[in-house]
């Protein structure tokens, strides 16, 4: 694809225009039953209570933690969708984040790591958005100057590197991967197969296909054949992690490859207004 693609705002506006020109073409996502989720949450909490003294303490604590965290998220706005970018050192995560936002929000540079604390981009500073940021533990955010109405429901977060030598950076990632609605893992051609991201993160969320995106970034540094080989290998690794239905795509901020596909996936997650519930349903299924 030639030239730099539009940011998320411009991409949404183009999609809105195309929808007006083609009113018969509609897209919809299957709904997740919130009432059914609430019943399963209640059942999980009850099972944890009944398991006290009978089951392994770690299992009881884990189930109770999932139930309490899910109930807390249910108490916040589910029209808001939280999307977080996580990734390895030097993978170009912050640069990709800026490209999607359409503004230089996150710091990107030569010194590593460049992201030391989570940074959010929001398109509307409402009480509901601020309450969600507080629950997430986000203390830094940028309000985008330009935006479309649909983006008011998006909270986009740039996380520190998961493989940073700074323990506080890894702690941030560990905290947020348990709470955000859609995870975008940004990996590079050199480290996409590292055991750390697969064993400590992706495999833990084997039931979270619908709310996981894995990006092989910086493919402009590879030949076409090598990029295809790396992407195929990454897809196989992600499937072995238990995420066979997760979106896996190639991207390059320099060439623009994959950025529109990534923006479309984020926009679809926001428009569906089901991503938060889908994430919680996967959490409960894992804990049950």
Language model features: what each stretch is:
Residues 29, 55-58, 168, 226, ...:
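Catalytic cores of large soluble enzymes that bind and process phosphate-bearing ligands
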Residues 125, 132-155, 160-246:
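Conserved C-terminal guanine-recognition region of P-loop GTPase G domains, centered on the G4
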